[in-house]
């Protein structure tokens, strides 16, 4: 029997080795789409060209990269003008890195790449130019059915003409438009292929079709969803950065067979992109998606939603709605949290992310541990007296929440000009990064850890392993009526915190959700025992042994001198010697400038590393019962 098992093991080992060897021999196809960045998108034809190429490419990538990394594109530029796709490719192309020695074949024409992978795809899903939401339905169907998405357009140079009517003449397996180009979804009568009455909305009927034909039948993977703008983008492609069509972001979610949507979270007005619809219809369908995902995930697994409200285009005052940008962000978070879903927040400005279906195969280490400070070390460094009391010497201690790194696209785009800045490491910084981003950009997360200095420490970003509002996990859950999601959240977060050596949650956005109650605090204490920073809490609190400090000011000024003014003024007003400040996308040199300025002004304010800050704060709470009990208030 032992000999038999040895032979089986040997055969399996040889088989696995052959697979790995075959993968290493299989060249990576690299499609260069950089010229699309130069198109004049004020011309309708150019905007359509960009949209069509990026959409078909992303759905193709999602299919062919599902099981191994085979197709890479060059396209996304960050705000500094640097090509992000080239940056990451070149980093891991170096000797000894993951892509070193891998053969490549370069392409400039999408049709050539489609020909290469023709046997990998079953055909095409064709969608309707006149019904914007069908583009998102096409991405959903593409992943489930192994189809590439192509917009119906019979003009001579369109992709539809070049791939379906001519060229390879790919078979159309799913029509989201009639074959003559007239709309399949009309907002009248019954919804095609379902027997369901029309909602009266051109936008919503395709979503109902998808829910009936695919979602309710269990055909898509409800652990993943994608919240990206639909074809409405083509109405004004230059309203913000031109890569905010975010079609590049589709590939990962296509590979996961996710469902795609672009819906308003507001129930008190029609969606701004569909003003004649019944008030709150978008929200109704959003809840249907989330409820069905919760049901299929059995309330045990969370739904990972990539994306963010496209607030400059839809659902806010920018688009003629009632609500402000942040309010819309928070309302979307509040709603999805009620159904055990969180978002990976690809927000406008830095929201484009390519090649995640490729990078998802990047090999991570088993664990990335971080060391916590000991009391002996605090004594040796002069922060703790021998009797266990804190050696303040008149000092106030501050900590920066270095954010916002709750988005895969944001950390991929900002690494070249923020993380790589030469001054990083000169002052202690608490880099607050959501560990769930390792799903889409593991190469970024790995790079952070292997290039970190002793002054770089990592905490989880808002609000743990994903951006949701944890108060909406607590019972009673008025939006959804579901049972508590706290135990599922603790289980979900624990896996990521353990892998990445995290014990601090650097910020908890409560927004318009309830604050954490005792059960919510117990939940966080189970995976974030060394500290949390919520919004709706007393100024100070010790929950069992977990230190809790209420979130305070955002420091937004780009001038570090004026930023220092705000910090000094705030520290003088606060009644406790521990202070948390949040900053968004600030450079290491900005933080160093503040520290230098504090010293030059001879203030008593000192920036600490995260373990020292939270451990001293815990000691302080234990030695000050009123502070531990949450009885300290602002004057």
Each language-model region and where it sits:
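Active-site beta->alpha N-cap acidic-glycine motif
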Residues: 356-449
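Catalytic grooves of carbohydrate-active enzymes
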Residues: 282-310, 398, 403-412, 416, ...
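Substrate-binding cleft of extracellular glycoside hydrolase catalytic domains
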Residues: 434-495, 499-500
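Preference for solvent-exposed, low-hydrophobicity sequence contexts
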Residues: 23-366
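Bacterial N-terminal signal peptides
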Residues: 7-18
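Short loop/turn segments at strand-loop or loop-helix junctions that form parts
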Residues: 127-130, 306-310, 396, 400-405, ...
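Positively charged n-region of N-terminal signal peptides that target proteins for export
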Residues: 1-4
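A recurrent domain-boundary module in secreted/ectodomain proteins
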Residues: 348-376, 613-635
